[in-house]
A protein has these predicted regions:
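Amphipathic alpha-helical
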Residues: 165-167
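Long, charged, mostly alpha-helical binding arms that flank functional sites
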Residues: 6-159
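Metal-dependent nuclease catalytic cores in nucleic-acid-processing enzymes
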Residues: 1-5
Length: 167
């Protein structure tokens, strides 16, 4: 606070957002370059639209709306859904991580903890939602890589997988 006002600011933090552009120009009804949200929701779902808006660029910068970017977010959400749905027999809410772990399991647990730390920092301190989503994509890739090396699941594997997926 610079002390220029005789009263307290009405908020502690302010996040100003950039403009959404279409083909390099500000979206505008008069220009006819808007995106119909109903069409996006119908074709891809509201979660896809939200993910794309948050993932495309830092919130303070302008970003160019891209149908390819929307499709990429849709594919990513489906990839996460498949990871969970195809492996639901290995997921339990009552998981318990007991150390020491096998090396590959220890690596995944470490990766999850690093993602938690980075995501928490990016949300709490920097409002960098695009990097949060990037870290979540990296974590999803790490879980897929770990899962691809497993033919059978031990109890330890189930607990580690549950921890990674439910986190």
């Amino acid at each position: 606070d610079l002390g220029l006002l005789s009263f307290d600011e009405p908020f502690k933090n302010l996040l100003t957002q950039g403009m959404v552009l279409k083909d390099g120009s500000k979206m505008s009804k008069s220009k006819g370059n808007t995106v119909d949200p109903d069409e996006i929701f119908e074709n891809f779902g509201a979660d896809t639209a939200r993910l794309f808006i948050l993932s495309d660029s830092p919130p303070a910068r302008d970003f160019d709306w891209s149908d390819a970017g929307v499709e990429g977010c849709y594919k990513f959400l489906n990839r996460v859904w498949r990871l969970v749905s195809e492996n639901q027999n290995y997921i339990t809410k009552d998981y318990k991580i007991e150390f020491p772990l096998k090396c590959e399991n220890d690596d995944l647990v470490r990766t999850v903890h690093m993602a938690i730390k980075g995501i928490t920092n990016d949300i709490a301190n920097d409002f960098q939602f695009n990097t949060v989503i990037s870290k979540y994509r990296e974590l999803t890739n790490a879980i897929y890589d770990w899962r691809g090396k497993k033919s059978d699941f031990t109890d330890e594997d189930k607990n580690v997988f549950s921890f990674a997926v439910l986190t």
